[in-house]
Amino acid sequence: VVTGIFKKSQESFTGSVSTITEKELKSFRGRNLLSTLKNIDPTFNIIENNVYGADPNHLPEVQIRGTSSLPTVEDLKNETKVDLNTPLIILDGFEISLTRMLDLNDEDISSVTLLKDGSATAIYGSRGANGVIVIETKQPEAGKLRLSYRGSVNIEVPDLSDYDVLNAAEKLQLEENAGLYKDEWAHIEMALRKRQARIKQEIERGVDTYWLSKPLRTGVGHKHNLRLEGGGNDGFRYSASVQYNDILGVMKGSDRKTFNGNINLMYQQGKLLFRNNLEVGLSESNESPYGSFDQYVKLNPYWRERGEDGKVLKELEQKGDFWTTAPENPLYNATLDLVDKKTYTTITNNFDVEWKPWESLTLRSRIGLSKQVNDYDNFKPADHTKFKDYSDEQIFRKGEYIYSSGKSFSYDWSLTLSYSRNFKEKHELYVGLDYNVAQEKSHAYTFQVEGFPQSNIKFLSMALQYQKDGKPTGSESLNRRIGVTGNVNYIYDNRYFADVAYRMDGASQFGSSKRFAPFYSFGIGWNIHKEKFMENVLWLDRLKLRGSYAVTGSVNFDAYQALA
């Protein structure tokens, strides 16, 4: 079992774990690694979100074995509850974000291990409460030079069969039955009756708009991967790969393009093994100019999409006695020159050296460095429906540009000592000790300006002023952590086993009064399928009885929240 820190025998592992092989990843491949894991393991759950649907740029809420933390009102309002139950993600021994996992080159992955319960995740201490996803990439293979290519097509088809919505006549009938066009005041009821007559006239003219299909399309994306690897018997091996992935969402105009490049070098000299992995990731995502799908679910079918001149209407109904603010047509904004784009660049270099003075003893040191730069551009011209109710005095406030830029840098260093030995054929002992230090520093700035009278000018510096009563904003964070982990595992005759793990975690997020916290687990088990009375039970491959107790934690909160 690959835990990301230690490697242990599955026969003596007391935790709940699923190991997914490269063959399974290829057989059940989805549009990204998250959807692939969902196709394979039923405990890996991606929560459905009907607001964002199949938006390729929206980070899904991922859970392993259900919810461990409940969101606050602020989490729901700011849409940050996604982070609360997200599992810890480890790539080749180093933590990565959910966004990075979403854009990984799945052709470079050799296996994925899901650590599900406390006994399995206690070695990660304050980060393991939500489960752990351990990803191992392919190592270069010795032999002749090999060049391989793999391409695929991904088709996203919207399915509206679950939506049973009323047509125009049925919707009007429902409103009439509910008494929407009656009022105790005669002048108000007269205005309501006029609106009712206008709607009936529209229905008689054949207006019956099925809004749900208007912003949707069948998205056809494609993925390409090229891999080169080789190396001789002199101890030097290498591999290089590039991948381009173009994902088109079912919402018109939404897409996500990613590029990944990787160079992996390996050199073995006697009892020393050196590895270096350099990876560059680029991503560009565009949101749909048609807005969110839930807007179209709320629109009345007796509203028409276009006017008599064939142009898309800006307002679906006139402002009057019934509407204090005229309902806007989300299709109108799609005719404008909008910008809603995010880009990021990640450069990661992981280096490790492994020394095996004896067959039973391994000492490994590794360090990972990662830098990320991200930008966000959002432009709405003056004709956008957001500004339709601005007065004449506010004409020079129409048009808006939001620009954000952020940078982050992190390092992660660990030193691991592992000892494994068999005694007298029936006794097997594993002892592991790990020391880990990590830091992540980030900062971001946001500028929000307004005043773009001309819709064809969408450059940030052409704005007339900052947003009213606004100013540039920014944020910064610094997270540090340190941890010492010990693990002892014993198995007798491949039948009876015990496992004990202890970790002392220190983190800047804990606050000054208590910087360190202990986490631990212990478990026992019995491999029933190894007993003699099970030898003739050919239809059963594995039957294990195990029990464990663990204490884990979660630090999914802001860097300075303990100071608040």
Mark where each language-model region is.
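Periplasmic N-terminal soluble interaction domains immediately after the signal peptide in Gram-negative
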Residues: 1, 115-119, 124-130, 136-139
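Short amphipathic beta-strand segments in non-cytosolic proteins
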Residues: 1-8
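Residues embedded in well-ordered regular secondary structure
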Residues: 10, 19, 23-30, 40-63, ...
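Non-catalytic regulatory/gating segments with a bias toward low-complexity or hydrophobic composition
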Residues: 11, 37, 112-113, 133-135
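Short acidic/polar hinge/loop motifs at secondary-structure boundaries
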Residues: 35, 78-81, 86-87, 92-118
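Surface-exposed loop/turn segments flanking beta-strands in extracellular/periplasmic regions
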Residues: 169-206, 294-333, 378-399, 443-472, ...
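Transmembrane beta-barrel wall of Gram-negative outer-membrane proteins
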Residues: 212-288, 295-307, 345-350
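Extracellular/periplasmic, surface-exposed regions of secreted and cell-surface proteins
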Residues: 222, 258, 264-272, 277-282, ...
